[in-house]
Design a protein with these regions (language model features):
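Short amphipathic alpha-helical segments and their helix-coil junctions
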Residues: 7-16, 70-89
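Generic structural signal for hydrophobic core residues of well-folded globular domains
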Residues: 15, 34, 38, 65, ...
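Core of compact, soluble alpha-helical bundle domains
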Residues: 2-55
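Amphipathic alpha-helical interaction segments
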Residues: 25, 29, 33, 76, ...
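Amphipathic alpha-helical binding modules
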Residues: 81-115
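An acidic intrinsically disordered interaction segment
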Residues: 2-3, 50-75
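Short acidic, glycine/proline-enriched loop segments that cap or flank alpha-helices
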Residues: 22, 45-49, 65-73, 84-93
Length: 121
C-alpha cells in the first residue's frame, strides 16, 4: 500500500469513527487535490478555533476552489464541519473537513483539477 493509500485509509477510518458518511471516492479526490500537504502534520490539520485558519479555508478553498460567493453561510459551514469532527478533537484532518464542505455545498461533481490546492495534484 502506498503512503497516499495509507493516508486515505486513515481518513476513511477516522470519518467512520466519527460517524461521518463521506464516500471514499470523495476523500480520495480531496486528498489528491491537497497534494503533498497531507504528509505535513501542521498543513494536514484544520484548527476550528483559529480565525486566520478559518479565513484561509474560506478564501482558498470555498471561494477560490469551489467558486462560492463570500457570505456568512461559508463561515457557518466551516464551523459546522469542524464541529462534526468533535470540538475537543485536535486532529481535524483537512481532507475530511474539505470533503464535508464539498458535500455541504453539493460540489462533488467538480473535476479533480478544480480541487487542486496550491497547484498540487
Amino acid at each position: 500500500m502506498s503512503k497516499f493509500d495509507e493516508k486515505v485509509a486513515m481518513y476513511v477510518a477516522n470519518a467512520k469513527e466519527l460517524g461521518l458518511k463521506i464516500p471514499t471516492e470523495l476523500l480520495t479526490k480531496v486528498a489528491k487535490g491537497l497534494g503533498p500537504s497531507i504528509y505535513l502534520t501542521d498543513a494536514s490539520l484544520v484548527s476550528g478555533s483559529d480565525a486566520e485558519e478559518k479565513a484561509r479555508v474560506k478564501n482558498n478553498f470555498l471561494i477560490k476552489k469551489l467558486g462560492l460567493a463570500d457570505s456568512a453561510e461559508l463561515d457557518k459551514a466551516i464551523d459546522e464541519a469542524t464541529a462534526a469532527m468533535g470540538t475537543s478533537n485536535r486532529n481535524k484532518h483537512r481532507a475530511i473537513v474539505y470533503a464535508l464542505l464539498v458535500m455541504k455545498f453539493k460540489k462533488e461533481s467538480l473535476r479533480l483539477s478544480d480541487l487542486m490546492i496550491n497547484g498540487h495534484s
